[in-house]
């Protein structure tokens, strides 16, 4: 099967297969561990369809009558390894043994913790601990509450307030669309913010999450606009993000009325007080609407605290806030329930620093003040530097002026000075003097000698800060993230600059700055900071390019900062809100929050103490709120409601009597979720959504993605708690039915998981077995007296390539030969010609004389040309050869009488003459031309006569330069090397009876080459060129065969070998009822090396001359097999989840299934694994009278994987054949899939069968609401496809976290499963036809680029798909927003670069999306971060939805690919380096290219059982350890469930370790003393240069393709 992406203009792709890296690295140790217990093949990714693991559960398999009974070949004995390798493996074993305990840590995360507990003990555990409730429960409960009443949400920073706002906006807009469909007046929603910077941020977030027209306004953007402008804005948009003042002015001028607003969202609502615009909007306009029916239904506010400024929480103004906003506060009853999504603070500490010195001025500051101190522009800078010297230190104060008077800023200062003076007076003589003072100040700073930074020149506060940072960034920790909060922008800038000085740099710390969008005059940096700049800084912070940010209050609220583990309050907070919000940034596990307090400063101490007191008071205040203000979740007073509810169901397991009731179902489900595979740092939980429905409450439970069943819905009950239990109960029943809970209600999924995710159903390319091999086709077994014959003409397309006149050869057979594909023959000196095998119409009935003549010609060819004298009758010959009267260029297809084209004269002459009679004295000179002569004593010597030489006699010495004869007499017994002895090759005993005449004529001739394999183009010219010589004819035999017939018959062995191979392949196709094109049939069955199919390895035992092997067809067939089975499973099994779809598909397309089905029909016998053999092409069953005999090999050794690969190649051949039909179709390929998989889940024989078997589900055909119709209309305008069923489109964008009960639609997962395979096929089609000469490895790697998550995520943003996704997870909202910002920045940079380069060679087709159509480099996405998985998922789901909606029209998929994907890949050279971005490949380049090390290995071995773990668990959940070993030391290691991903993980870790390490440090650390040879050094230098192509390439950026063919 196709290899996963192994990670050219760039030579990076050559590292794997062609570069010196591949020659010097022990590839066996990388790809195939040689020690016992190590994996023989790298298993595949989870859900990698070809790498499915057999469950090994014999009971389960026996229960299913359709279960495959796999045949598994025993592994062959391991090949021998060198002593060096053996020592390395032994050392690796010792290392594993010594570190087994450490390696085993964390493995219990993948095993059910409670596996050994009884069910009763689980019950007792549950009684003593509450089930953790997902934060999403509270978010959705708050969302539901906000839909019915005005609400003030009081939630911690990072707990998802913005998500709730987005959900509410979407819900409001969807209701607005329904109202508009009813002809109700238009209304619009407003999202109001307090700060200008937040306008851009919140608009960017909402625009990423709402696929509706949104607009943003603030400040200068709406000055001097008219009423028409606002009317147009309100008509064209569904929502507006703006500062509150903007809306207030619009209401004041009556550009809009309050009854035209359907939603108000107040961001950070605690600002609603006094004359704040929030308060004025409510008091002046909202409250004035007396008719409650005309008021907007919801006025909602978001805040982290109802407390503002320094107000005592005990007298908090929540009643005032509630009354002013006409809303009710809503907060969580148990704040700790949000901790797993919010703050995870470990400790909060106070650090003291020495008292600051009194304010003073440095000498530079005083000198500058004397020059420009009176100028207004310098008043704020001087005010800052007056305090900077004492608070930061004199070095920072002087450094401020050095930065202030940078060269590019001086001109701006002069211009500002002029404007300032002119503003006071139209003309002033002081202008020149003041400008000169500015210039003088610049010269003064330029001439000042600045000292290097040192602790003596820094304040004690800065010194302590540096000490803290050094302690926090000690060692290598790539996950360390720190924010230092300061009060002033200049302080942030100067501290960042200080840490960038060489003397002050802290290893591992990369400083950055995050400040607001204002432009204070005191700042030395006058550049305006945009929201985009802020987001790009945050992205760098997230990626680790920056890990310590100096930030002002802008980082406290609003901006979505990545989770941190160090927060430092350099300047203490002024308000409780600042404290709560800045502390909320410390969300990583084990975070620390540091207050920097001045020694002996009671005010500082009081502030810190007051923080805790105020927070405690606030918490008590929230707890004291009335019950209707609290979000209780779904567990509130569960015991009471369960006792009260009588209508509870119960299930008893018949076999064991175990009972499942409502309360216990929560425990069972929690245990099951905990048993699912997950990273050690992640805690999986089930999500519960309880909605109010007629009659009470109904709950939907959603399980994590790794679960085989994703969701279930319970019954309606009067309480939330019982409704929740009902949903859990329904889910448990489904798990029991699916056998994911055992007879004791314990999870079995962990034990079954390897059966569905690892590589036990894959077969190995290393496991081989002997199989019978068909040498000859069945056609030749039809013997007997011929009554009628059919003919095939063997002609040359370019007969001049032979360099001798020739005529076609007729092959006469008892049955017609199928069409044989043309193929080339190679004649040396760059001469070649295609051979056409042309079936001649009709048949011929011959008399006995004619038959005997054909027998004579056939046997004469065998005897005279090939030195094989057979005794055979016409009944014994499988075919006959005959000369023809027609030429190579003749049209044999128009022959009407077959017997007329046979050269019967030549046939009769051959039949009547065994040899041409030769009279020594009576022959004319013409006799000695154009005859074919054979040596009866030496079968290797054949001659063409050129003519008589009257100037030579037999006793003349053989001239120099004539090729010497090979016979023994010439070398041993001949005393004279004359022409006579040259011509007589008989042995000594025979020579005694021969006395050739010495007066006979001498003839000039050509010695013909004996080479038969004309199929091989890798030959020397000398092997095929005739050599001149001089002979006498008396000891030789002149053949009766015509020379033009002989010239063509010399090619017959190669032709016959290819015909035999083609016929055997076609017989296999006929056996399977597949009418495949002949050349494709042969290609599909051709295996030309021992490791065909291993595209990334050097070929072993390559056999030339076999033509194209199966690899390209296998690449194509693999993808079609995936698509066909995917469509079939999607069609036939509509009620299963995506996970089960993957399982079912794995069972169909896994190599083990193909391998076993192939063996059942003996397909392996037809595989062509042997190149041309000069003794195997002769007919079988004939009696050989004279000539060498060789027993034919009738067996060949094939790897299990080879047989499976041939199955896929045959599917590929069927696909190409079907595409050539009129019209092009898939029918033949679909029949091939059905034959190969042989499964009830794929029984289709034509493409139309797929849709004929599809029954549209009820949700697809249900009536659409206005929201769904609006979405379909917008997508039609954007994408060009009009959906017949808009609900399909809606489903394609519904994330699994979005409750299905909202719109009664399933999530996109089933459609994504379908679209993934469809998009794969479209990509493979494009590459296969666009690059007909590309090898399968290249095709696989570049296909991975096209279908990678990284590209599809970019495409989702490019097409605007991200705005249409419906989800209920704040983490997804955050990820999408960050990724969209990054990808749009990369796109803009690409456009900017294109505008600077008019003749951009990467210009491609304009985008049809909503972005401007222009030319730019389409690889801008390569260097971006990984996208959130939902983005590539919705692209695939959209493709799947279009496919289903169009009644399975694949042309729609091709159109999507051509319009939206192909423009990015017109120049595939852009992605050569990306295609090779595989961790192991890249590590190989680093080790040899940069480190110059040759002694390293990547070793994989089974991890021994963990002490204390049950043996059964170990057997069912195998773990392997992979280590990068360098000179006997472990550089990096990883533990994984499969060898393949262990190697990837270990390589990533090794790359991380080597990042920033130079060759000298590496050699010292690992004792490397490798000395490379001259060629190796040159190759290493080349590799090192190539690695610079991706200078930022690091382990964090490595991506392995998620899709594609299984390995």
Curated annotation (Swiss-Prot):
tRNA processing listed as a keyword: no
Domain Helicase ATP-binding stretches: 142-324
Domain DRBM: 1478-1556
Residues annotated as domain RNase III: 1063-1219, 1272-1447
Limits of the PAZ domain: 905-1040
InterPro entries: Dicer_dimer_sf (IPR038248), Dicer_dimerisation_dom (IPR005034), dsRBD_dom (IPR014720), DSRM_2 (IPR056755), Helicase/UvrB_N (IPR006935), Helicase_ATP-bd (IPR014001), Helicase_C-like (IPR001650), P-loop_NTPase (IPR027417)
Residues engaged in binding Mg(2+): 1312, 1433, 1436
Marked site positions, Important for activity: 1429
Reported cofactor(s): Mg(2+); Mn(2+)
Domain Helicase C-terminal as annotated: residue spans: 461-632
Entry EC no(s): 3.1.26.-, 3.6.4.-
Region (Disordered): 1-74
Family from the record: Belongs to the helicase family. Dicer subfamily.
Name of protein: Dicer-like protein 1
Name of the encoding gene: DCL1
